Every structure is written in C-alpha cells, then in structure tokens.
C-alpha cells in the first residue's frame, strides 16, 4: 500500500513559475511532476525523519518545479545551474542528494554523471553518504546500480 502524505504536512498549493522564466520558455507540468514524484519516493536518512518518505515542503517543491519544469521549445531545461541558499539544519544535504539521484537515475540522460563540489573531502562526502543511504533504502534504485566505495569515508558512523 502506498504511503500517503500526512494530512497536516504542508503542500505547495498554487505553483507559479519563477519570475526569471524567459519569454521563449514555458512550464511543463509533466516534467516537473516527474522530478517531484521521484524525490517524494525517496526516504530521509537523518534525524526524526529518518526512514520516512521525503515529502517536499512547499519551498522545496517550488525549487524543483522551477529547475525541472521550465523548459524551452525543444524541452531543454532553462536553468542548468541553480544557486540555493539554505540555513543550517534545514535539509540541504537531503535535498542535494535527492536532486543528484534524480539527475543520475531519472533525467533520461544516457550515462549520466553527477558531480559534487566542496571545500574538502569530508564536506563532499556528506551529500554522497546521504545519496548512498537513500539508494540503500530504495529497492528500485538499488537494483539499477552498484555502489563502489573507493575511499574511506570520514563520516562519524563509519568510525566504529
């Protein structure tokens, strides 16, 4: 049985495309819905939400719909880069990992490659570790990939 969004959990009610949408572009609801649905089928990996469905908050869904749903006449995304500034403890790593997994698994790009950048290896490993855990908790994704850890993770849970 499908897990339903909790009744008291906020949902984006009236999506309005970004004010930065070019006149030559349009909003493709199907493309945006695909990204939202993919992400909302992942699981949180940390804190009180660990193991629960990744129901997007309205501000998160607005970002996803803008980035993946605004396209040109050929269907290419208008936004190839997005700068998103989020305060501490507001799910940056979870959202970044979810977007990276969408780009890797569901964006219809053959041999897709997704890169993460950070000031150092420990910081870069945070999003990778979250994405790795999300894949481990999603049987459909786990069947489609093999994760090879080629470095010693500096994350605290791996220190024993």
Segments from the language model and where they lie:
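Phosphate/NTP-binding elements of NTP-utilizing enzymes
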Residues: 1-153, 157-160
């Amino acid at each position: 049985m499908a897990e339903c969004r909790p009744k008291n959990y906020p949902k984006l009610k009236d999506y309005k495309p970004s004010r930065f949408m070019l006149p030559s572009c349009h909003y493709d609801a199907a493309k945006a819905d695909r990204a939202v649905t993919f992400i909302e089928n992942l699981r949180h990996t940390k804190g009180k939400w660990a193991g629960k469905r990744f129901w997007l908050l309205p501000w998160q869904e607005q970002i996803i719909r803008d980035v993946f749903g605004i396209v040109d006449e050929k269907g290419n995304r208008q936004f190839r880069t997005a700068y998103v500034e989020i305060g501490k403890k507001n799910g940056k790593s979870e959202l970044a990992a979810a977007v990276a997994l969408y780009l890797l698994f569901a964006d219809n790009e053959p041999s897709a490659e997704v890169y993460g950048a950070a000031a150092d290896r420990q910081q870069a490993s945070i999003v990778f570790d979250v994405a790795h855990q999300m894949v481990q908790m999603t049987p459909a994704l786990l069947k489609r990939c093999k994760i090879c850890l080629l470095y010693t993770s500096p994350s605290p849970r791996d220190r024993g």
